[in-house]
Amino acid sequence: MDTATHIAIGVGLTALATQDPAMASTFGATAITLIVGSLIPDGDTVLKLKDNATYISHHRGITHSIPFTILWPILITFLIFTFFSGTNPFHVWMWAQLAVFLHVFVDIFNSYGTQALRPITNKWIQLSVINTFDPIIFTVLCIGIVLWVIGLHPFAVFFPIIALLIIYYMIRFKMRAVIKQQALKAIQQEHHPVKVFVAPTIKFMEWRVAIQTDAHDYVGKAYGRNVVFSDKVERQTLSTDSILWKVKGNKDIRTFLNFSSIYRWQTTTLADGSTEIRLIDLRYLKNDHYSFVAIAHVTNDNVIDHSYIGWVFTEDKLQRKLYAK
C-alpha cells in the first residue's frame, strides 16, 4: 500500500491501543510505536538514492521478510523504552509486532507484492486485488479516524471498519476471478494461454489485464465484465543463442527479470550498428505507453555501453535517463 494508507492504519491502531491499560498512560509513545511500526518496513525506500536497480531489487524484499518482520518490532521496542522509560516493553513490542505484520500483510494484496515468506522462498507474493492506493480503503480509514477524534469509542468505530474491509477484500477477489474468466474466454478462442495477469486500478470497476499465450501477448483493460485488449504483439522466441542471454548478467536486466512476473522483450538495430534490447513489463500499460522497462545497448563486441531500469512515462525521458548513466 501507499504511505498515506499505512499512516492511516497506524493511526487506527493507535486508537485501538489506547484501550490497552498498559499503553493508555503514554499516548505519545503509543502513537510513535504504531505509526512507526506501520511505516518502518518501507525504510528501504532510501535505496533509491543509490540507483533504481538496487531499489527495485530490495524494495518490499528483505525488509518485508520473516526475519525483519520479527526484528523491526524488537528495534522499535528498544528505542521506545530508551526514550519513554515508563512504558511496558512487552505491550509496546506486542503492538509494534501487530503494526509491522499488518504492513507486510496488506502489501501482498497489490500487484507489486512482497517477499513476505523469505527466506523460506524468494517468490514475490502478488495477489493483485487491491491497488497500491485504494481510495475506498483510505476514505473509510479516514472517516474512522475522524469519528474517533470527535469522541466515539475506538472499538465502536474500528471493529465495524475491519468487518467492512474484510467484506470489501472478498468482493475484490470475486471481481478479479470474474474478470480473469472473461479474459480467458476471449483468448482461448485463438490461442492457448500460458500466463494471466489481472490487477486493479485506482478506479473500482477498471482492471488491468495481460495474457501471454504460446504465440502472442495481449494487454488491455476490463471495464466491469467487459474486457478490451488494446495491444496484441507476436511473442519473440527465446533460444539459448538469443542475445538476451548475453545481457542477463547486467544489473539492470537481471533486476528486471527477477522482479517482473509477466513481460516481453524485443530487439532493435540502432543507427551505429549496436543492438537495443528492451524488456517491457506488461503490467504497466497506460495511455499506450509501457512505463516499467529495462533497456540495454549492446555493441558489436557484445559490450553493454548503456543500460537503465525504472518507471518512465515518455520515450524522450527514457532516452535521457538511459544516456545520463
Predicted regions and their residues:
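N-terminal membrane-targeting hydrophobic helices
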Residues: 1-186, 191-200, 210-214
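C-terminal regulatory/interaction regions
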Residues: 182-325
